Each structure stands twice: as C-alpha cells, then as structure tokens.
C-alpha cells in the first residue's frame, strides 16, 4: 500500500502499485550488474577533471533524455520524434545538469541529482497521463494540491516498461556514485557551466520559434519530446500583447458597446433567481459515436422542452481542468487566446475580474458559490473572494455521509441549493453558482455504496459502465431540482451544463468513433469537447434548440433569457455569436464557411471578430493600466 486518504471516516481508498513480474534472467542480470558495480573501485585522474566532467555531464544528459522517452512512449510512438527534436531534449536535460553543477562542484552528485529530478518529473507525467489522458506541463504545478486531493481515487499502476526504467536508473545511479570528480576552484567551473547553459538555451530558443506546446494525449512527448514540451509550456506562461492591440483599438470597441441595452425577450417584472449547475464530467457520449445501453441514461434531461433552451456547447478542456470551463462561463472569455494547458484560476486571476458575478452584484444580486469539495481545489478559496462572491460553501457545509463512491452526491448539492433558496430574504435577488463532484474520474474501482445500473450492450468497458451509471444517477437528481422549482411562485432560471467529457479507457474510443483519440479531423476532435447544456425557467420563455454554442456564450444567453440588460461585453459576445456560434481552445465554427477552423486560419469577418475578441480579452485580463471601465466595469463597493 502506497498510501490512503480520508474524508473524515468516510473516504477509505487505498492506492496500489501493481507487481511487475520480470523474467528470471532480467532479475538475475540486474543483480549481477548491480553488485558488480557496487564492487568496483574507480579512481579518476584529478588532472583530467574537466574531461571527466564533460563526459559525465554529456552522457548523463543523453541517457536521461532517452530514458524519459522510453518511459513515456512505446516503440511506435518513440520512433515518431525527429532527430532535431531529440537533440533539443538532450540539450534541455544538459542545461539542468549544468545548472546543478554550478551549485555542487561535484560532477557525480550533479548527475545523480539531475537524473533523479528529471526522471521524477517524467514519472509525474506518467501517472498524470494515465489519469486524465493528457500530459503534465508547467502550469500544472499550481494544480498539485488539487491533484493530490483526488489522487486516492485512482489506481497507480506501473507497466513493464516503467519497471525497466527503474532498474536501469538504479544501475546508473549506482555507477555514477563510483565516480568522484570535484573542483577546488569553483569560479572557473561555474563560469564555464553558465556559459554553456546560456549557449544551449540560445540554441533551443532559436530552434523552437513557432513550435507549439502540445497538450493533446501524448503529442507533447512524441512530437516535441517530453522535456522540451515541458520547457515550452514554461514559455507559454508569458502572455504577449496581441497584434493590433492599442488603446485606440479598445476605444473603437468602447464606442460601439458602451451602453447597456434592454433585452426584449423574456422580460420579467421581478428579477429571477439564477441558479447555475456546472455538472462534473457530464457529457453525452453519443456525439462522439453511437452505442447502445440497457436503460435510458438521461430520461428526464431528454424530456425537458417547455421553457427551455437546449443543445450542445463546446468546452475548452477534455477529461480535466474544470475551472477553465467555469471561468469561460462566468467571464465570457475564451481559452482560445491563452496558452495550451494553462489554468486561469491559478495563473491569471490576481484581482477582481469583470464577470457574471460582478455584473449581477452591481444590480443588487447576492452571489453564492457552492462546491462540495475542498476549498483549496483549483485555488477557489482565493479566486471566489476575488470574483466577489458574497458566500462560499465547500465540503464542510455539506452532509458528508451523502456520498456516491467517494464524492458528495448531486442530490445533496441540489438539496443545499434548495435550502439556500428557502432561506433567502423576501426581497433578495439570488445568484447561485454550483459545481458538482459526483461524477469525477476515475471510474475503474468498485464501490460498496454504488449499484451500477447502466451498461453498454454488446461490449464491456467497466469504466464506461460506471461512468454511464453515474450520469443516470445525475439525471434522477436533476429531476428533483427542476421539480422543486417548478412549484415555486417566484421566477427562477436554471442553467445546467457539463464542464468537460470524461477521460475513459483509450481502447473505448476506437470502438466509439472508429479512430480513437489520434488522427482526428478538427471536426471529429471537437466532438470530444462537446457537452450538453440547457437554460430552463419556471416562467413562460418558450423553447429553443441550439445545435452548437460554446461555454463562453452561455452567460450571455442566460442574461438574455432572464430579461436582464446586457453589459457591454455581453453585447459584443451576443453580436459575435451570430457570426461565430462556437469557439474554444481547439478552434471555432465558421458560420460563413460552414465548418470548424483553427483560430489562426480565420479570414474575412471571422478574423475581424476573433481579433476584436482577443483585444477585449487582453484588455480585461492583462492591461490593468488601460482597462476599459466602460466595457469591463469594476465591482461596485
């Protein structure tokens, strides 16, 4: 047992490492080599310290870079990386070796520390990829606390290749400890190491211009090499001013969208209570491919029509990074203009951003956030007060006996929403933003407290069956929520959407779409980023079907449906939606061309809309000195 984590006395999940069964000859050979190395006595000529150091550092960088690729990729994928990219990976590793050498002046110790650090980074990526289906990058470092909080619900399994990596690294470390090379004069050695590191960095920088950080599946490792891809993700943390950005460009947009306009559709005499449910991993997998199940998975969701806008929306994430979906909904901004793999809550929110929260607070709403998990997850304990939420409710505010698998149920979350509604003052306008946890991955373990009712017909994927059973449970809880608010007299609007699709067995996707997760067209790829949504009211608002939108537009649709005057930024989004109905981190849907395109391939009016969108988003997020208070009004104190 590696470890366990508890939530009070409720969560009891052990994390197990699989036993790797090596052939006898492998273990015998390892033993012979290991004890042979241990018995060696190696004395190096101190007069040749520079030569020995150069050999040790160079071979250490090469061995570590190739060792990492061997750990992360099978032979077929390893063969895809070009020699030039592999050289860049070796140089990245060498920079680490050189940097450590400056501080140790002991080349053997340098090689030991550098190899362990780099291999540990690759080891983290090894498990992160197993759990969420994409790779660990620099911005994920800020998510470590969140990752550790849910790590106990996953199985940590080492495959045979990982076992060989451990054996080879053990032999390397044992050998390197036999080599004693140190420098009495540290300053000359440090100058040489720093100079070489700078030259390596310059070479890497020159040859990575235009190279993008890959975050889809294992593309980072087999297109760029893992270490290089990680380094590129560091570069992406620095946001450049977009082309065409200026105060004058922002002023032009101010002149177009500086006045609020009333929405003529769906106005109500009293402002409605607005309830948002962002449902964890809630998805309709049939958009990816057809399959059959033994029961109807979401009969209640499917029945919703009256007073409902309903359809599908593009998320910008797959399998993880929930807060990016939350951020797109609340702010109207898009991950399309931010680096791949970034997490906005942990990287870019340092003050009070203009959002649905600030806009509703400015017209008198009490804003409440609910999330039945730890407040530190994705730094929500910092972000929510910055956003201006009046109340926050986290796991300690929920009944922790009401769990399914290891997470608070949707039913318990909805009952908490009802309780807060019933306790509101008679003249209180209420906005509740809730984020569920029930359906969180992984889906491989069996639980005594969960009777899985749904299963696929004709084929057996245990994790898929568990996921589908969870969605079925969510549907029952959703029926409770809607049924309750159907009966209340005051106007209520409920916005419901999934944050992203789940990360399931990689072997499931070829069955579902005939291709799997690789070699997809942009349109096929966007299917994996598609989630269901609806906006329902308990008052007359008509029914509408939306074939496709995106999460950044949903708050604008919600304000329109609620009869609330659109702030300037939402006016812009409403107009843009007419030309570009959906946009996310992967691309956008061009109405004029009738197909998905990458943002950089936009032309004509599409390019104009996207450029103005990027300018406004940059002004809102990064140009604090020149932020437009007309388009992005501050929260009134």
How would you name each of these model-derived features?
Residues 127, 131-140, 159, 243-247, ...:
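A diffuse structural propensity rather than consistent per-protein peaks
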Residues 1-14:
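Single conserved hydrophobic/aromatic residue that forms the stacking wall/gate
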Residues 12-221:
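Transmembrane and membrane-interface helices of multi-pass
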Residues 258-268, 279, 284-637:
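Solvent-exposed soluble domains appended to multi-pass membrane proteins
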Residues 141-144, 224-227, 231, 247, ...:
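Alpha-helix initiation and N-capping motif
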Residues 204-276:
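Membrane-interface segments at or immediately adjacent to transmembrane helices
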């Amino acid at each position: 047992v590696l470890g366990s984590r508890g939530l009070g006395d409720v969560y009891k999940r052990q994390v197990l490492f699989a036993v790797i069964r090596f052939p006898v000859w492998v273990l015998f050979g390892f033993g012979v080599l290991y004890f042979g190395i241990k018995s060696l006595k190696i004395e190096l000529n101190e007069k040749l310290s520079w030569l020995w150091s150069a050999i040790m550092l160079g071979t250490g960088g090469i061995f570590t870079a190739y060792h990492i690729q061997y750990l992360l990729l099978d032979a077929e994928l390893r063969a895809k990386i070009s020699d030039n990219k592999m050289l860049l990976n070796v140089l990245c590793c060498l920079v680490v070796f050189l940097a450590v050498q400056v501080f140790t002046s002991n080349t053997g110790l340098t090689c030991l520390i550098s190899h362990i650090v780099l291999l540990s980074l690759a080891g983290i990526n090894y498990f992160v990829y197993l759990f969420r289906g994409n790779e660990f990058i620099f911005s994920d470092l800020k998510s470590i606390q969140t990752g550790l909080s849910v790590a106990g619900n996953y199985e940590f399994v080492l495959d045979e290749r990982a076992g060989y990596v451990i054996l080879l690294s053990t032999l390397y470390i044992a050998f390197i400890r036999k080599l004693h090379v140190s420098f009495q004069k540290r300053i000359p050695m440090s100058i040489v190491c720093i100079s070489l590191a700078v030259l390596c960095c310059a070479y890497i920088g020159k040859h990575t211009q235009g190279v993008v950080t890959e975050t889809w599946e294992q593309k980072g490792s087999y297109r760029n090499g893992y270490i290089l891809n990680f380094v590129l993700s560091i570069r992406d943390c620095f946001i450049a001013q977009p082309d065409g950005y200026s105060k004058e460009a922002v002023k032009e947009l101010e002149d177009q969208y500086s006045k609020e306009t009333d929405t003529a559709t769906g106005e109500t005499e009293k402002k409605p209570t607005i309830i948002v449910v962002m449902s964890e991993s809630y998805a309709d997998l049939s958009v990816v491919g057809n399959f059959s199940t033994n029961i109807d998975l979401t009969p209640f969701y499917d029945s919703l029509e009256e007073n409902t806008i309903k359809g599908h929306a593009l998320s910008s994430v797959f399998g993880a990074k929930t807060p990016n979906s939350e951020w797109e909904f609340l702010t109207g901004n898009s991950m399309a203009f931010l680096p791949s793999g970034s997490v906005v809550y942990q990287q870019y929110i340092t003050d009070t951003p203009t959002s649905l929260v600030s806009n509703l607070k400015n017209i008198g709403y009490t804003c409440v956030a609910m999330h039945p998990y730890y407040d530190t997850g994705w730094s929500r304990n910092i972000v929510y007060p910055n956003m201006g939420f009046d109340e926050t409710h986290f796991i300690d505010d929920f009944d922790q006996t009401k769990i399914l698998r290891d997470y608070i149920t949707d039913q318990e979350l909805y009952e908490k929403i009802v309780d807060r509604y019933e306790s509101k003052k008679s003249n209180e306008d209420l906005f509740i933003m809730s984020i569920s946890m029930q359906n969180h991955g992984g889906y491989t373990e069996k639980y005594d407290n969960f009777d899985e009712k749904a299963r696929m017909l004709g084929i057996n994927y245990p994790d898929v069956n568990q996921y589908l059973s969870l969605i079925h449970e969510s549907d029952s809880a959703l029926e409770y929520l809607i049924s309750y608010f159907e009966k209340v007299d005051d106007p209520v609007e409920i916005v419901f959407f999934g944050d992203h699709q789940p990360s399931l067995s990689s072997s499931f996707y070829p069955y579902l779409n005939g291709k799997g997760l690789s070699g997809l067209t942009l349109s096929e790829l966007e299917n994996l980023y598609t989630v269901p949504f609806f906006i329902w009211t308990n008052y007359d608002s008509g029914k509408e079907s939306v074939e496709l939108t995106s999460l950044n537009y949903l708050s604008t649709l919600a304000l329109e449906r609620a009869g609330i005057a659109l702030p300037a930024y939402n006016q812009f989004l409403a107009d843009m939606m007419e030309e570009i109905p959906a946009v996310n981190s992967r691309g956008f849907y061009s109405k004029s061309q009738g197909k998905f395109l990458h943002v950089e391939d936009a032309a004509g009016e599409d390019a104009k809309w996207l450029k103005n969108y990027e300018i406004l988003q940059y002004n809102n997020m990064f140009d604090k000195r020149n932020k437009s208070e007309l388009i992005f009004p501050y929260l009134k104190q």
